Amino acid sequence: HSTGEVKALVGGRGDKSGNRTWNRATDTCRQPGSTFKIIGCYAAALDAGGKTLASVQDDAPFTVGSKTFNNYDKSFGGFTSIRWAITKSINIVTVKTLQDIGVELGYKYAEDFGISTLTDSDKNLSLALGGLTKGVTNLELTGAYATIANGGVYLEPKFYTQVLDHDGKVLLDKTETQDSRTVIKDTTAWLLTDAMKDVLTQGTGKLARFDSQIAQAGKSGTTTSNRDCLWAGYTPYYTCVVWGGYDDNSKQSGKLTSYPKNIWKNAMSRIHEGLETKDFVQPDGITNATVCSKSGLLPLGGICDNDPRGSMLTTEYF
């Protein structure tokens, strides 16, 4: 992700049947599910929406107009922080956060991340959950996550640096024309990454974690009836997004939802063999403080630390 170079791309399974055949990584648009929570909501919320990882929403039944939003397990957790909502992929908190910061802001950030398939009809609260008109390509979703891994700087995915003829003359050159732009602050990127590290240790991505001291972060995603199952993850070295589903959009059984995580785990484990142990570098400007987990604010003495359910104090990065 530090160069934008595409090291490997798989457009389908099975034996190759020809050249320039349908490539599901570049040609197919599919619904990204909860992987889009980071791209269409939380990145904007932390970067420009006045939210922090400690900010809370009331995870409770929520209806806007005729649309009722639910969590995937149909349960509700009350006042919940953004960090925990990312870790456990809680829909209600995400939708309420996008409502707070404004759909237009989330939409703009998603475009800045390199998502080119958005339409005006996507300017609604379903954007927070990846409910898109056309969907996204795996390549562009990978580029978006690589932006976070790269400290907030988007680099256009490139498949070559130069193409030369037999005389050494340059025919195609990507060394000077690669699109590059800052999408989010490096501090925002680090905070998102820190939250997504929890996804692999405490949340919906435990199955994706490979056995290594190299830092890993990521986000899961599924759509209705498991028609799309995704795992978007990265390390300080590489970003990889895996999608699984049927071309005809058929339902998948629940047991198949783990396949993208297992594929990511096995592939990334091999790719990182022999690489130096590395963590994501914390940029200047990051600090931490003790807050009340039920308000996201500085605690009041004798209240947050005296809850009958136990102390509500927690330490968070800002």
Regions found by a protein language model. Name each.
Residues 6-10, 15-28, 135-317:
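A penicillin-recognizing enzyme superfamily signal
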Residues 68-70, 102-143:
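Mid-domain, small-residue-enriched loop/turn segments at the edges of structured enzyme/sensor domains
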Residues 4, 31-57, 85, 144-148, ...:
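Active-site SXXK
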